[in-house]
C-alpha cells in the first residue's frame, strides 16, 4: 500500500512521543510506502484533492531501558512531487489542532478524495462535525454535568450551584486554556471575560471531578473498539493531567464502566467515519472525544509491551482488502 500522512512539519515531531511517527513506522515495517505532506500543501485540481508529497524513510525508535530512543537523523525525505491523493491507498489526517480556518479548509480539500478509491482517516466531514469538547454532549449518561455558554451570568449560576468546576475553551488542545473555577473566585469576571472573549465565544464548563487527582485516562479506540489505555497524572500543583502540561503517565486497565462508555459511543463514531479516536475519561465520566490527532500510542506501547500502531495499519490493510 501507499499511505500518506498529513502532519505538522516533520522536523517538529518528537519520534519518541509522536503517534503519527509510530503509525508511519508501523506502515514501513509492514512493507508499505510512507509519504508525508502538510495541510498547507493541499490543493484542489479539476475537483480532485492533490498534494505536494514526499516519500519518507524512517529509522524506527528502539526501547532501551524502559524509554524510547531515536536515531539521529531518524528520517530521510525524498524529492517532492505534486500528485493526486487518489494515488494513495489511504490518507491519515494527523495535523494537530487548533481547529482554525486553515485546519477546516484542509478538511474541505479532503472532501475531494473519492473514498471508494482512497480511505481518509478520519473522515473530513466527521472531523468537522466532531468538536472534541462538544461531541461528548450527545452521550448524556456518560458525561459529567456540563454547560456550554458565553453568558457570564449563566456561567456564574452554574459555578455557584456546583461549587467547583472546570472551564474549557472549545477549540484548544493539550490542556491549553483549561482553568479551575469555583464559586467566590475573586478573578471570576476576568477569567470568564478572557475565556469567552468578552462574551463572544462560548466555553464549556463542567462539574469538577475530584477523581481527577487520581488521573485522567486516555483510551484509544480503533473503529469504535478500545485497543489500549494509559493514565495521565498531573505534575506538581497543576490540576491538568495532560502530557503536554508536564503530566506523567502510568499503566492502567480499562474498567467495565469505561467499556460501557466505549460501547455507547461506538456506533456514532463508525457512522461519522471516526476510525482512530482517543477518548478521555475521569472517574467513570467521558470528558472529551479526540478525533483530530489523538496521541498516546508510544506511551501505551512502552507501558504495556503492545504494538498499537501495527494494529491500526493492519486494520487499514484488512479494510481495503474488503473494499476491493
Curated annotation (Swiss-Prot):
Co-factor requirement: Mg(2+); Mn(2+)
Pfam families linked to this entry: GSH-S_ATP (PF02955), GSH-S_N (PF02951)
Enzyme Commission no: 6.3.2.3
Cofactor note: Binds 1 Mg(2+) or Mn(2+) ion per subunit.
InterPro entries associated with the record: ATP-grasp (IPR011761), ATP_grasp_subdomain_1 (IPR013815), Glut_synth_pro (IPR006284), GSHS_ATP-bd (IPR004218), GSHS_N (IPR004215), PreATP-grasp_dom_sf (IPR016185)
This protein's GO CC annotations: cytoplasm
Reaction(s) catalysed (UniProt annotation): gamma-L-glutamyl-L-cysteine + glycine + ATP = glutathione + ADP + phosphate + H(+)
Lipoprotein found in the keyword field: no
First-tier enzyme category under EC: ligase
Ligand binding (ATP): 159-215
Signal peptide: none
Keyword Metal-binding included in the entry's annotation: yes
Span of domain ATP-grasp: 133-317
Gene3D superfamilies: 3.40.50.20, ATP-grasp fold, A domain (3.30.1490.20), ATP-grasp fold, B domain (3.30.470.20)
Pathway(s) where this gene product acts: Sulfur metabolism; glutathione biosynthesis; glutathione from L-cysteine and L-glutamate: step 2/2
Protein name as it appears in the record: Glutathione synthetase
Annotated organism of origin: Nostoc sp. (strain PCC 7120 / SAG 25.82 / UTEX 2576)
